[in-house]
């Protein structure tokens, strides 16, 4: 091998430092728009600083969450529609934080690829910033890892990390009791779980990502990339109003596995499936794959992205509050004295 005249450089190995610096410069304005009380510095330092007192806390408990977007990224990569996956990444983390009763404060991302494409990376991270802005948390740092030989051309991976806080004694779940009402908040589609099965179902259907969507006006790929709904501000408003005993983010495992995570030992849930309409995407998947209702309910959100467990006497007030904040709310069931989730009515 003949060496370059002036010796080898990092660029010769496939790592473009200049592209990385250009990316940071491009995303700084988007990150700056996420600034909130408590943020002490912008991007660029070795670590990010956050002042909990400046954010209004006196005796805070910190809550941390991390997540990814799963194989939904494969659809984004194959179609080139990458703008929304950053919102997915944020939502998967911050929606989990509010289930503990915490306000999301700040967010960090990890973006990894084999060869950095500045425009694509910027679109993704600008999506992350938009998600943070909508959730009220600051994008205070991240890592862009350009790793030649680790990923096929054009591929990338994402991970997100978020920290929130609540005052001591305010953690959820708390005071869940038999008879508590289950309020279901509508999802915006599949969100970010079950996409290995989604992709298999699309393969079985014989449709391509750019084919017209069978249940919507845009392409199939674009429809399946609808971002995960952010429930942060609505959930925090409900918590502040009083009467919320628990929240369950309906992700991998569906309603069947996620709701029991916030119920105390000895209690379960009775859910009436006729209390909301199954979104068309789930009906199409069930029909395409010949899926049974039980399998749907333990795999997908089936139209309910977040469940609030609330005191019976506060259910009407909270329903009205959430509806006023733009949520499609359904009273889907109640907490019962037997463990597990039992269903009545039909979904399919």
Curated annotation (Swiss-Prot):
One Pfam family recorded for the sequence: AIRS
SUPFAM superfamilies referenced in this protein's UniProt entry, alphabetically: PurM C-terminal domain-like, PurM N-terminal domain-like
Keywords from the named record: ATP-binding, Cytoplasm, Ligase, Nucleotide-binding, Purine biosynthesis
Catalytic activity: 2-formamido-N(1)-(5-O-phospho-beta-D-ribosyl)acetamidine + ATP = 5-amino-1-(5-phospho-beta-D-ribosyl)imidazole + ADP + phosphate + H(+)
Annotated metabolic or biological route of this protein: Purine metabolism; IMP biosynthesis via de novo pathway; 5-amino-1-(5-phospho-D-ribosyl)imidazole from N(2)-formyl-N(1)-(5-phospho-D-ribosyl)glycinamide: step 2/2
Gene Ontology MF term list: ATP binding; phosphoribosylamine-glycine ligase activity; phosphoribosylformylglycinamidine cyclo-ligase activity
GO CC annotation: cytosol
Subcellular locations according to the entry: Cytoplasm
Source superkingdom: Bacteria
InterPro entries: PurM-like_C_dom (IPR010918), PurM-like_C_sf (IPR036676), PurM-like_N (IPR016188), PurM-like_N_sf (IPR036921), PurM_cligase (IPR004733)
A Gene Ontology BP annotation from the UniProt entry: 'de novo' IMP biosynthetic process
EC number: 6.3.3.1
ATP-binding recorded as keyword: yes
Membership in a protein family: Belongs to the AIR synthase family.
HAMAP family with a match to the protein in the record: AIRS (MF_00741)
Matching PANTHER family: TRIFUNCTIONAL PURINE BIOSYNTHETIC PROTEIN ADENOSINE-3, TRIFUNCTIONAL PURINE BIOSYNTHETIC PROTEIN ADENOSINE-3-RELATED
Protein name per its UniProtKB record: Phosphoribosylformylglycinamidine cyclo-ligase
